[in-house]
Amino acid sequence: MSVKASINNSQEAVSRIAFRCSDALYVVHPNNSILNGALTESLKDLKKFETLNVSGKVPHVLPLKSHADPFAHIADAILAEEEVASTQPKQITSVVASADALFFATPHLYKLAHEPLVAHVAIESTEAFDFASVRDTGFVILFSGNRPGDSSEAALEDTLETASLAHRLALKLNTGVLHFYSPVYDTTAALENIETLPSKEDAQHARVAHIPIEEKQEDSEKEGNIKEAFVPPKFDQPERDAATSEYLESLSIKPFEYSGSDDATDVLLVFGSAASELAKAAVTSSVAVAIVRVLRPWLPSKLQEVLPTSTKRLTVLEPITSLPRKWDPLYLDVLSSFVASGSSIELFAVRYGLSSSEQATEIIKAVRDNLSGALKPSLVCDFTDGVSQVFVPTPPSIEEAYHKLLHRVFKSRLNIVNDPASSATKQNIPSRLIISPQFALGSVLEYENQRRAFCDEVATLLKEKNSSVSSESLEVLSNWIVSVDNLESPVDPELVISELKKDSSAPIKSLLDRSEFFTNVSHWIIGSDAWAYDLGNSALHQVLCLEKNVNLLIVDTQPYSTREAVRSSSRKKDIGLYAMNFGNAYVASTALYSSYTQLISALLEADKFKGPSVVLAYLPYHSADDDAITVLQETKKAVDIGYWPLYRWTPALEDGEYSDFKLDSERIRRELKTFLERDNYLTQLTLRVPSLARTLTQSFGAEVRHQQNVDSRNALNKLIEGLSGPPLTILFASDGGTAENVAKRLQNRASARGSKCKIMAMDDFPIEELGNEKNVVVLVSTAGQGEFPQNGREFWEAIKGADLNLSELKYGVFGFGDYEYWPRKEDKIYYNRPGKQLDARFVELGAAPLVTLGLGNDQDPDGWETAYNLWEPELWKALGLDNVEIDIDEPKPITNEDIKQASNFLRGTIFEGLADESTGALAESDCQLTKFHGIYMQDDRDIRDERKKQGLEPAYGFMIRARMPAGVCTPEQWIAMDDISTKWGNHTLKITTRQTFQWHGVLKKNLRNTIRNIVKVFLTTLGACGDVARNVTCSSTPNNETIHDQLFAVSKQISNELLPTTSSYHEIWIEDPETVEKRKVAGEAVQDVEPLYGPTYLPRKFKVGVAAPPYNDVDVYTNDVALIAIIENDKVLGFNVGIGGGMGTTHNNKKTYPRLATVVGYVLTDKIMEVVKAILIVQRDNGDRENRKHARLKYTVDTLGVSTFVEKVEEVLGYKFEEARDHPQFIKNHDDFEGWHKTEKNKYWRSIFVENGRIENNGILQFKTGLRELAERLYTEKSEAEFRLTANQHVILFNVAENELGWINEHMAKYKLDNNAFSGLRLSSAACVALPTCGLAMAESERYLPKLITKVEEIVYEAGLQKDSIVMRMTGCPNGCSRPWVAEIACVGKAPNTYNLMLGGGFYGQRLNKLYRSSVQEKEILNLLRPLIKRYALEREDGEHFGDWVIRAGIITAVENGGANGAVHEGVSPEAF
């Protein structure tokens, strides 16, 4: 195939460069036929010669129309691509266009400024483009082909080189570039130099610039052709400007170029579309001239460098624009720069306009002559004679068919309000305003107002019968005014004007001065199909709302054959349907090349209709060069297939009228008729009851008796209603259920008093019905930072902005809050804020209070009930129901203890709930029972509100947790766990802080399959949650296999013997449901029994942890029972026993607190099972079953006292504890990530870092796949290796043979499982799941902690502590799943983005931390930690850990006694609040 040898014009130059440097090239076809022809020919050549881009691929070429807001399409495409594929390489985009395409581009350019987008814009010398509209969009702006003295060949080469530079700049700095060039024709230049184009590597870097660095590194290794990952820098504007300047300077690019003598005193700074013509004229006239080559970034120092030192006066030449300005933008740039630098050069401003290149010499001469005179500084001169109008985008000639038809139909009556051609008659109005549909609508409204005033003036003249006006004139005016709005009137306006001209009176002359109002004009606003992409930004919506007599003709140009290419994000709205839904507009869908008659009828009907009219006109074409045959073919295809239906619709505007819809599409009408005939026929055939005549089925007597019964029933209802008390509507908003439960109780009490009462959530109540209510009571809780609960937010948003009259309404509000929840003074506004806001809003809307605002406070002696018990009697008094005697047996609230007692050993109605396919949820009481089965019901809180708006129930899913003592997992078990997550979960595995697995997002229908697969590999979920002994945690002790074997045996024994014995687990999850049903019918012969737990199990959960000093990787003291192994010569002799550890608390409730276990004695290994059971029995019999917040073992120990509790345990045992024995001091509570280690049995182990325990595949790492494949190979090769899950949410690969190290190392390197190159801070971190699945979460945790650590790492690196371990943990609520209370730094979630910052925990889990600052957000956290970490780095002693230092430095005081009896709340600095 032949090869292109040269470039012949600038259009070909920029299109070639853009093609070579892009993945997607948008070609905006200009209306200029010469420009468009050259561009089209260039694109054909690129296709003909099979040109490739720098990456060796053929880019996509997408044509756009210049008058249809092309940059809106481009911005949507780029931003939609980034949103959909945020972790995938993006396309590099370029644009070739002319200045008309930038007409409405400014708002879109702002969005694209940080994209590597290059737009090459052709601008003719006579084109008055307003550069001010794009100068501050953030784009780099370059000019080419404008150097003084350049020949055509040199100008073409300059354009070619600058186009290449623009792409290199965009890709290198990840910034948008506008390249303006002056078109050059009929010359020749060599093809582009490949060395000047961006490299393949530059292009790839730009494609992945938005992807996180870790993923790019992985992609780099996969690609094999990129040596190192590269991230284009992200700058704010000053930094971007500096980087651009530096890059331009490295390429020897001059932002300004000077031509003239070295001792010139007067210099012209030429800028704009005609800069090249003016520069040439200046050089010819021996006038010194400087040219702007780089407008943005503005580099004033470079300007002063090129100016001669002899310069005294600088004249800035800028193009004229249609917008009135005193000072032009470039002049102001130069002025501010010179003033800032203290320059003494005088400045002058000149505006020019060029209608032909010959005028350039005249303008330069005029400027020189003016400068030789005595001008004052800053004088503005205009040289604009003969200047062409500012460019206004106009539709191509192919769309003139509808224009011509309008002129033919309406002749002199036609007024196309936004016709660009009319700009010549509106000299004082900017052209861009004239074509704006909003301006056009305003013009019509103003015209109609003036015409109405004109008609009133005529009517007044006829009424007063002015003697100076002739009788003939009055008769003519009388005939005209009678039919002024009648389109069929026989009165000809031209004849009226002709007759009035015979009258010379002053009133008639005044009317003739406004003779245009005699004609009943038909106003038309013409728009393109671009309107259909955003109906709110066009005049369509305003026209429909204003209901004025305005006609819209909207031309749709999209061919049927290209409809699939339209992205969903840019899908057109149906304008016709939109307009018809308003019900006040005439709507027609027409196609000139399909039905000429239908179009004529639609135009006439639209003109006749007294109101807004919308006529959709179909004119499909691919490019402006398409002929009528192409349009005809596309039209026929679209109309025949039904893509473009033809119809007309006239609405009914008055009572008694009927709307008239005419379907003009023959094919659709024919098919619809066939369908309706068949449907009607089948309907008649399928009537369930024969339709017989009434005379055969009814009698008059029967009708009378029926009416008597109806009247009697209505009379009885009225009588009963008269006897009842006042109506009452109770609304509630509650996240935790408190307000809802109180509302239900209030409803029962109101009903018992005779009130006609109804109850519902606030969001379920239609706001517009408030005005019809008599009495409304609202019970509302407080969420987050004084926010409404989720089921009350829509109600509040609606009433907050509603314009209601509630003068007939009486209301009462009671709020539930906690005065100490936000202890800082500035945060007190959040206390009971929803209740206060509602009360104030009801008053604003005119409602009268039934009772004063009630504010429940959890800090009161009886909590919220203290205030409520005073508020409710006042409510009954206001309703007149206070003296009503009632005898109501209010059932006590159902507690967890009631649910357990009635559950028949954890059965409840779970079995029936699983069979209910109408919902994805289980009953509330069953959800309490499924916890004992290891299952939590959750929903996706990220989409909860959206689903509620859609009328859907929450996206329910279930979390399942396995019971896996000591976290030991075989390869076979790992494969099964992975299969479950893939088949039925959310494709991730979660390692918990209790050394087991969790699965999220399991649907109700998949619960049985999931649990059956868990059981198949000899695991269970029973007892993994609920008020029983949970999974037993145990130190991993990988260095000593002998010790771990002993500890693992103890852990398994404790786990198995504390496992509930109920058969409900097997019955519900394992057995076949049909078998269970049959057995129930036959009658249950065997009854369950729980010898250890009893029918109500424990008051709360019971946790056991086993540690082997010196490692406390399980944070043993945080468990209800802490077992610390006493080891001699690799033999576990026994255990020191600790009791009363626990993490869960409630914010600002000092009755709740974290506590560390108290060591009470020592027992031998063979007796440890007896001891654990005895402790459990004492807790079972003495724990608080009334208040679940006070039910954990730690509260039982503190309530009874440690000595009393121990006595009770010893009483159960029948013997006493021995004295606690000494053991090696604990040295740390986190995992070891220092590569492979060898055990005493010559096996190997190493830790695998899993951040926050989330095993998943993402765009950065494929951990899930890597660990799955590792497990598969270990299982296939029957390896003895196993996995151990750690309590810090990581994985230990253990028991690896030496001959397996080779392939395991390769595999781990392949999936980056061996990557432990993280800071000590990150390696020691942990987080709970929190949002979006955990129902208790108040703030983010797992998803946020890595981001926060990244920012804290910057502080750590600054202090030189990157290798030092600082234990940092985060939870989304105060329940403490990640054990934050023993971390050196902890963030405990309190509200969205808000945390309590805790400091001072023990490095190895031996000490609780304490509140340092309450209710802080990210910025405050970083500001607080920065000085502390810097001080720690400078002041610490050898081996001193951060938690120890903050206590020694007096930052906080140490928590005494392990936190017993709430010691963690003591000694908190007032500054914390």
UniProtKB/Swiss-Prot annotation:
Q: Which keywords accompany this UniProt record?
A: 4Fe-4S, Cytoplasm, Heme, Iron, Iron-sulfur, Metal-binding, NADP, Oxidoreductase
Pathway as given in its UniProt record: Sulfur metabolism; hydrogen sulfide biosynthesis; hydrogen sulfide from sulfite (NADPH route): step 1/1
A GO cellular-component term linked to this record: sulfite reductase complex (NADPH)
Gene3D superfamilies to which the protein is assigned, alphabetical: 3.40.50.360, 3.40.50.920, 3.40.50.970, Sulfite Reductase Hemoprotein, domain 1
Q: Where is the Flavodoxin-like domain?
A: 728-876
Give the species this sequence originates from: Schizosaccharomyces pombe (strain 972 / ATCC 24843)
Specify the protein name: Sulfite reductase [NADPH] subunit beta
Indicate where this protein is primarily found: cytoplasm
